[in-house]
């Protein structure tokens, strides 16, 4: 009898969890093609995930079904829907862009110069499970760049604990030292293999001129199943008690360097840009 009761409890719990999750898909309203790596955010519960390469994602039912779901994808209008009205297949409307602050044109200059460096000891930063954010570094303009107008490539140092993992890069113009207009209107998705690696991403095809106001390079973690990672760890609670537990995050980790000032580093969280942990990219 005891065995039957235990088995019933397991089946009931499993069934409840299954019904609390739904699979959704995001499609381009015009082409009907999947929209990959869109950010999906439940406002009241601080839950942020991404659609995968096929535009699909699994979303847990929020405590309040009247909560709003925000969908933000590069190249598309932001969509805000009540969870109770959220269809399993959602279409996103492409938007047109007017870039007032950044010039984009054909590149003819073949000379190169590096800006930014890697120095000292680095430390790895994970994304966490529920508090995904963007981490951006500001590169101010210098007169030394007058003869080197176009941004050719970006180099990022990452540490990856799984076989392969993906992340996105975003490029923003600057206004009063803060991130402003998003320059790239398509995903710059990068795949890295296991280990600590320097990865150089060629963006010369975007033909982006270095703005006089400077530019921000932002790193975006992707909350997709293929990036999911767990490991055993000792966890300390608020009372100083230690216990064995499981740490969850999304790979890869971004390697950063601490600096005396964080004025050039910004963190995008809950739809707001704020000064954050200092990090080093290398732009060349």
Feature map (PLM): residue ranges:
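A short, amphipathic beta-strand motif
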Residues: 22-29, 55-57, 90, 102
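Extracellular beta-sheet/turn segments enriched in Thr/Pro/Gly and aliphatic residues
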Residues: 85-106, 201
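Short, ordered, surface-exposed loop/turn motifs in non-cytosolic proteins
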Residues: 22, 30-44
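Bacterial Sec-dependent N-terminal signal peptides
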Residues: 1-25
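Aromatic- and Gly/Pro-enriched, solvent-exposed loop/edge beta-strand patches characteristic
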Residues: 166-239
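Short, acidic Ser/Thr/Gly-rich low-complexity loop/linker segments typical of extracellular
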Residues: 46-56
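A short, solvent-exposed loop/turn motif at the edges and junctions
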Residues: 42, 70-81
């Amino acid at each position: 009898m005891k065995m039957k009761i235990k088995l019933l409890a397991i089946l009931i719990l499993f069934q409840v969890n299954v019904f609390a999750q739904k699979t959704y898909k995001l499609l381009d309203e015009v082409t009907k093609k999947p929209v990959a790596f869109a950010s999906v955010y439940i406002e009241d519960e601080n839950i942020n995930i991404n659609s995968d390469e096929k535009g699909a994602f699994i979303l847990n039912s929020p405590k309040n079904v009247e909560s709003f779901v925000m969908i933000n994808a590069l190249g598309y209008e932001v969509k805000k829907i009540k969870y109770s009205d959220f269809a399993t297949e959602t279409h996103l409307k492409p938007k047109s862009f007017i870039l007032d602050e950044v010039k984009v044109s054909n590149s003819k200059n073949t000379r190169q110069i590096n800006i930014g460096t890697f120095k000292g000891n680095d430390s790895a930063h994970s994304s966490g499970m529920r508090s995904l954010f963007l981490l951006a570094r500001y590169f101010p303009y210098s007169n030394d760049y007058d003869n080197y107008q176009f941004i050719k490539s970006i180099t990022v140092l990452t540490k990856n604990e799984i076989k392969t993992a993906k992340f996105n890069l975003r490029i923003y113009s600057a206004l009063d030292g803060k991130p402003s207009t998003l320059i790239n209107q398509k995903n710059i998705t990068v795949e890295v293999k296991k280990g600590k690696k320097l990865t150089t991403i060629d963006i010369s095809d975007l033909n982006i001129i270095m703005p006089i106001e400077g530019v921000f390079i932002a790193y975006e973690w992707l909350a997709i199943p293929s990036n999911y990672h767990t490991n055993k760890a000792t966890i300390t609670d608020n009372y100083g008690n230690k216990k064995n537990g499981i740490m969850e995050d999304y790979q890869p980790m971004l390697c950063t360097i601490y600096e005396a000032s964080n004025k050039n580093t910004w963190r995008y969280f809950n739809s707001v840009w704020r000064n954050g942990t200092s990090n080093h990219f290398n732009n060349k």
